[in-house]
Amino acid sequence: MIAATVYCIVGCNTGSPDKDALKVLECDTETGAAKVVQSVNGCEGTTYFQIDRERKFLYSAVSEGKKGAIVRFALDGHRIGEMTKLAELPCETPCHISLTPDEKRVAFAVYWSGVAGTVGIDGSDLKTFTLPNDDMGDNKKRQQKAFAHQTFFLDPKGVGRGEMGVVDLGCDRVWFFDPYTMERRKDLCIKAAKGDGPRHALFLPRSDNKVLYLVNELGSSVSQYAFDGATFTLMGKTSMLPGGFNRWAEDGENLVTKAAAIKTTADGKIVMASNRGYDSIAFYEVGTLGKLKLRNIAKLRGKFPRDFELMPGERFMVVGHKMSNEIQVYAFDREKCTLEPAGDPIPCWRPLCFKFL
């Protein structure tokens, strides 16, 4: 039974004029209506956050001048409470964080420094690793060095330590580590195509972690990999853009669009990925062995859809339009894989991350 009223936490980028770092949306799953019911400040931006399984705490990356930090907010139902600083980082603010499967450590990826690491949920035992600047991608403007963009786990729903993947946009790689020691596994690595610039990885929910999707920011595509527990094998790569669309500017050096987030429906039968520039959501049907078939590319009202999330019940989608500083709710037609605006946009400074409670 899906509740008629649900709550969604929104992370806002640094530099917000109203100083808000987090907002809470109250959403109606039957009509799509949404409104802000809480705004939280006291820190500079929340680039990305994660919520623990018991929904007691929200862990976030925040900015402290030129350095980053990991903080924790207490949750009381849908209310965000007091913030506790857990750890200062020796580098800038992470662009992504996650929790280890046993929820004893916070993992993070720092884009510009090319650093990945973990820290205990009590702020102790900080471990970091600087990704190697080897074998850069072909895009000379975006792949000058290693760029850590995401951390994820081979067994995301497990209770053990798991093994951590780090998506490297600069080197077209996914590296793997022990999250407790940050020792790199030299026998396991995904090598994406040159110039693809991978951004985020996602396991197909119903695949027992045997199918992995990799959204390529620079290539505007989704790669599909089979995983047998020891090796990732490329099954295919599917474009996120319509045929004939030129993703390069007239100078041939600058991209006019780039991919961002990747999600699936709850049953894992539809995969969705967002285009920033060619502002849209690409929808794919999941076929045999997890291979993807493009169903539709739904154009959006706002600019630069950085992140998005389906409401519980999956009749509506909440999209964060970073460059038009707004949140827009869209009605989602699952059969046609289409989106239609539902209501007026909600003003919000550069929304970056959405999580429903």
Give the predicted meaning of each segment.
Residues V24-G32, F73-R79, V119-L126, F177-E183, ...:
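Short loop/turn segments immediately following beta-strands, especially the blade-tip
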Residues S39-C43, L86-P90, K140-Q143, C189-K194, ...:
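Surface loop/turn motifs at the tips and blade-to-blade linkers of beta-strand repeat domains
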Residues I80-F152:
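Asp-box/WD-like beta-propeller blade repeats and closely related beta-sheet repeat scaffolds
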Residues V10-S16, S60-E64, F108-Y111, L154, ...:
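Conserved beta-strand positions in repeat-built beta-propeller and related beta-rich domains
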Residues L255-H321:
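Loop/turn-rich, solvent-exposed surfaces of beta-rich toroidal or solenoidal domains
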Residues T128-Q143, C189-I190, M235-N254, I346-L357:
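Surface-exposed loop and turn segments in beta-propeller and other repeat-based domains
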Residues T5-V6, E54-K56, D102-K104, P156, ...:
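Short coil/turn segments that connect the beta-strands within blades of beta-propeller domains
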